[in-house]
Each structure stands twice: as structure tokens, then as C-alpha cells.
Amino acid sequence: FAEEKSVKTNWKVDEKKRIENVSPETRIETFLEMDKDLTSQGINVASRMFSFGTSLTEKYFINTEGSIISSDVPRIGAYGFITVVENGKPEQAYKQFGYAGGWEALDQWKLTEQMINEAKVLQRVIKEAKAVKPGKMDLVCGSEVAGIAAHESCGHPMEADRILGREMSQAGKSFVYPGGPFWLGTRIGSPAVTIVDDPTVKNSYGYYEYDDEGIRARPRYLYKNGVINEFLHNRETAAK
């Protein structure tokens, strides 16, 4: 394993509104009210599906090198899936939300406003959207598309165990591999593009301060100004 300093600490994510203090009745009523507001906009939202869940992850990490780390992370997640139908034509939208913290997440998400906006967009798409002529063109991508591309096409290929072949039979290999045309320092994109894996963003769903090997979290610049900059390592791959 790569050498790391031992650490003794405990950390947690605070809740401004404790999830455990919110009754099941309040949780259900919150989403029933959202559904009521959504269906009173004069838009034919033919189907709606909402899901909501909470968790509290408590971890106690200890290793033979002297590290002792305890943590408590409450998380809250929700998603909405709606179908709008106009003149017999359906369009669908899916919105997902995640937060490390307490019930205050719902105040920040503004679920009702976001789902109503999605319904209005779908209605407009059905009524006004025009087919695009085939061909090459410049596109401006929204966060939904850009996020998927960053995660799937940029994030997974930078996993060092995948790069070294450990994931090949289960989840596929990477376009980056030893002896290949792409490696650290190789330019593969525009200087305007930098992609960062950052688990230290406060209240993000994937937030953590120390990982499951006891390593302090930090932003990792996978691609910097269009250049392959660093990989996602565990202690085993970091030692190679």
C-alpha cells in the first residue's frame, strides 16, 4: 500500500433540522402538497411518481497503522418522474436530488418549484419544439447532459483499478491504459475544460472528509485545462 500518515479524528455532518424529528405524516404531506400544486397549473401531468429516502451512516475505522476515525453522515434523497401529455403526445422528465445534512434540504431544493418548471418545459417542448436538421453543429449542454458525460465518460475512465485492468471483466476497461496513446500529461480536450472529482463540497450527497481507507479527502483534478492530470486511486493502486 502507498504510505500514509495515521490520523485520529472524528467528523460529522450537522443537521439544521434533524431528520429523525420529522414525522412520517409530515414527510408524506410534503409530497402530497407538491403533487397538488403540480397538478393545479393547467398542465396535463398525466402521471407522477415521487420517491424519498433518508439514511444515517455511522462508521468507525481503525487500522494497524494507528488510524482511528469515526464519522456520522445523515443523507436525504428524492426524485420525481413526471409525464406531460398534450394533444396525445407525451414527454417525460426525471429530476433527482441528494443532500448530506438534514430536513433543511427541502428548503434548498425547492422541489415544488422545480417540478412545476419541468412540467412547463415539457409542455413547451411538445407544443413548440422543432426537429433538428442532421449534421455537425456546436451545442451548449445543460447540467443534466454535461453531468452524465463528466461522470460516465470522464470519471470512470480515471479509476486506477480500471486502468490497470482490475475492472475489465466486470465493468469494462478504460481508454487510458499502460503503454496506450493516452496517459498522464496527454492533451485530450480543450484548454477550457477542467474536470474535478471533489468529495469535499459541503452538503453534497457524496460528501466525506476521510475515505474508507482513512485517507483525507481532497479535490482531484482528473483533467486540467484539457490534459489528463491524475487518476482516482486507492492505496493499492497508488503504490504502483
Question: Residues of each region from the PLM?
Answer:
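Active-site bordering "gate/hinge" segments
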Residues: 1-219, 224-227
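C-terminal, non-catalytic macromolecule-binding modules
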Residues: 227-240
